[in-house]
Amino acid sequence: MNASSLPAPTLQHVLDLTVYVAVPIEAGTVVGLNSRGKRRIIPITGGTVTGQVNGKVLPGGADFQIVVSETTADLDARYMIELDNGEHIFVQNRALRRGSVADIAKLVRGEPVAPEAIYFRCVPTFEVSSPALEWLTQSIFVGTGARFPDRVQLSIFRVA
């Protein structure tokens, strides 16, 4: 068997998230420049989760971004989900977001941009304490996202 005959992975939809965000804290006032770009911190104020698990995104998390250029940002969001049954899931979601100079400038100003104009892909990982949720720690997950003025929409898929 050679590598080209291996089966291609498939994607299974797992959940959708709506993550509400506050006004970004820009690098000049908080962290400053680093070797890769400017630091931007976007507080997470809440949200919803639907799909194979259902619940809410708790306030208190944040997206710790590095703005690499006028067109590209590396994202590192960390937040807690509380499920309807009271269980908790900690999420670390690393992502890449890029678009044209004009479209990224609109996002920064809080203006809407068509989701298809922005490349926004993520790789979330999950920490759980419940054996019933352990499946979230035993697969690779990927997702696609869209940034709106007050929120981020994410669809998450298990790589099968």
Segments the model singles out, each with a brief description of its role:
Residues M1-A160:
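Beta-strand-enriched cores of mature, soluble protein domains
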